[in-house]
Amino acid sequence: MKRVFTTISLALVALVACNKAEEPVAAEQQGSVSISCNVTSEVEDTRAEVSCTQPAIDEFSLTIDGISQDYHAEYASVAEFQESYLHNGRYKASVKAGDLNVEGYDCATFEGEAEFKVVSRQHTDVEVTATIANSLVKVEVTEAFKSYFAGGYEFTLKTELGNEYDVTEQSNYLFVAPTSIEILATATKQPNESGAEGKVITLPTERIENLKPRTTYVVKFDVSTAGDATLQITLNDSLVEERNIDNELNQYA
């Protein structure tokens, strides 16, 4: 019996010694990491900030994925991560607040990501900048358009997600998913000299595809009365459509 107890005791001592030897090795392969998040509502094309509600930092979820190794972790909030230890290697931190499936005015979704490297026994500070993930759209008309279509006009914007918005008198940007949109419109011409009511004209559908995140799209409708009345549609000040109103659009009246 003494031999049995002695054998077991020696085995336990060896196991404890082995575990103690492994602990420093594991620690040597890890580094500490802190992650912070900042938010900007600056858009890509103008470098100006747009007016929208920015989420608080604790509203951002955090995902960490390994790049040089198999690793994945999710946190409901950036604050939940605090300071943690990760094994040596390269990682990517992604933050998100909002939902791109929720479109509308002041419905901004913010996303951001940053890659970082963990080095043994070193501390790494990671800063992730979250930017607007939506596309921002606004429909405008010129005074010349209003004057020519004095009988009134209606504009409807449709998104790829199936949402529809009345943008007849739009003053703020509409936050939509970065996919594609369609703008449909009807306009009533001014009464003629005999007093007859003006004709209602269906304007050409304006479709914009491959929208980009963090980018503004201003679609402007204008009427040029130099010579024949001409409908002009611009996208961010670039002409994308031009139609003779009497010859090309009256057929849709």
Language-model features: locations:
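Sec-dependent bacterial lipoprotein signal peptides
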Residues: 1-16
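Extracytoplasmic cysteine-anchoring/structural motifs
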Residues: 18-253
